[in-house]
Amino acid sequence: PVLTPLLALLLAREGLPVLLHGMRTEARRVLASDVLEALDIKALAAPETIANGQVAHIHTQHLHPGLARLLAVRQVVGLRNPGHSVVKLMNPCAGPAVVVTAYTHPEYLDMLHATFTSMGMTALLSRGLEGEVATDPRRTPRYDAFVAGQHRLLEEQQPGTAAEVPGLPTEIDVATTAEYTRQVLAGALPVPPALARQVEHILQLAAQIS
């Protein structure tokens, strides 16, 4: 299931303002925005100030119409283009912010490393699952941190895959994912340890720039 909304809400529970941005480029895919809507968190119609402890999400069109048009090309040709890499680097926030992003293919690690360094960005980079920034709950990936472009390896990838994550559903539909998210936030189900670790890394980075 898509766990990016859960990651965002766990961070908000710790007092951070959290913004998710993106758009649909595949017809059948469950998006983080779908799950957030099911949790009664409506999309922003335009950029606005996000309060501490708030999760907001916004369509790429409202941040950069040209980039949204480029991303939409995938629905025509069926392939990703450079816009999919650019959108993962976006920091649409005024003031200090941590960009949380991920790569799927290992060869992108060096490229993203060089980009964050040259642009002086503050970011957390890890290997994601199916294009999502939330970590695979069954594994602990490598984490690379960047503060004003300065790199630090936080954690190497841990070997092995968890045979089971308590309470994690096998279904990936919107309703099931939203209900799982509710149950974890309510304490009825445990936070997956891998996701809790990711939250810790983000909180530590945020503390360095606050």
Regions found by a protein language model. Name each.
Residues 38-41, 49-210:
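Glycine-rich anion-binding loops and their surrounding alpha/beta cores
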Residues 1-51, 56:
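A generic, well-ordered mixed alpha/beta core segment in the N-terminal half of proteins
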